[in-house]
Design a protein with these regions (language model features):
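Active-site core of glycosidic bond-cleaving carbohydrate-active enzymes
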Residues: 1-15, 19-23, 64-227, 264
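Detector for glycine-centered tight turns/loop "hinges" at secondary-structure junctions
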Residues: 41-42, 106-107, 251, 261
Length: 302
């Protein structure tokens, strides 16, 4: 469902939202409703569910993150599509009252009373950081929690595989940590690249190379939260970088150039006429082509 939502966001094709995303996500989220129970303080908890390839847990972080994101996204879809769904109050109640993510001194847990204490290749328990961005760099304390969680995840090395390195790279990139993102991506290369430059790990799977490519995309361009971030997590050793026509949410094509560690040129083409909010390290940028107006909002946001 999240991938379907991104398909809509990158195209802004409302028919995708109405005919595919909304009905599919509605069914997926409503499946969770019988698993919810309310405590004496009115907080909603999940009964025992399964964290992929790890085990069972109540208040499983994997499901809490997806449920919270799903309810918020359904409410947004109803607003966009002008749908008065009878379940909107239920989804809003869940979004308001769903319990916090279980965590301990090592960061995010698998679920209630289930710490992360054996090696695991997936970052299923960290989806709230990426790709859902429910916890993100714009929130106080989230970065420290992310770093603690990733470091603990990789501190148990027995089942840390290629996908673990790309996952950590994506998580660090989401929080603007370009050097750490590159370090983890290089970990993938050291583990899985062969002398002929081809990837090989265990079976005939492709998700690790694809997520490796996505690591580079996330270093160069991010657009979650309806804000285009150009070069948000570029490693310090990448002093000269350029990309052309990468897609951003809101149906934008973005190109940019970075020289000597500074962004010198950004070009944005709107394909759907959506509002454009840009974050950049450019000092006092000016519009040279087109009739767009830059309105400073502080901290490099226009």
């Amino acid at each position: 469902c999240h991938n379907l939502w991104l398909q809509y966001r990158y195209s802004m094709d409302e028919s995708i939202l109405r005919n595919t995303v909304y009905p599919t996500l509605r069914r997926a989220i409503n499946f969770y409703l019988p698993f919810l129970e309310e405590d004496g303080q009115g907080i909603l908890h999940l009964k025992e569910t399964y964290s992929p390839e790890y085990g069972n847990a109540k208040d499983c972080n994997y499901d809490l993150a997806l449920l919270r994101w799903g309810c918020l996204t359904l409410l947004e879809a109803c607003r966009i599509l002008s749908i008065n769904d009878e379940l909107c109050p239920t989804w809003q109640h869940i979004a308001d009252k769903l319990t916090d993510y279980p965590q301990n001194e090592d960061g995010m847990m698998i679920g209630k009373d289930v710490p992360y204490n054996r090696s695991h290749r997936h970052f299923s328990h960290l989806l709230m950081f990426y790709p859902l961005h429910l916890l993100n760099a714009e929130q106080e304390g989230s970065k420290e929690l992310l770093e603690k969680s990733v470091e603990h995840w990789h501190s148990l090395p027995d089942n840390i595989l290629g996908f673990s390195y790309t996952g950590a790279s994506l998580l660090y990139a989401a929080f603007g940590e370009g050097n750490k993102a590159l370090e983890k991506l290089n970990g993938l290369f050291a583990l899985t690249l062969r002398p002929n430059t081809m990837y090989m790990e265990s079976g005939p799977v492709i998700e690790t190379p694809l997520s490796g490519a996505q690591c580079v995309h996330e270093m160069l361009l991010q657009s979650w939260g309806k804000k285009i971030r150009v070069f948000p997590a570029v490693p310090s050793q990448w002093q000269d970088v350029r990309f052309q026509d990468l897609r951003a949410e809101g149906a934008f094509l973005v190109s940019a150039i970075r020289k000597g560690g500074k962004t010198t040129d950004i070009r944005i083409k709107s394909l759907a006429g959506e509002p454009c909010i840009l974050q950049t390290d450019m000092e006092n940028p000016v519009v040279k082509i087109g009739n767009a107006m830059l309105v400073p909002q502080g901290k490099g946001v226009y």
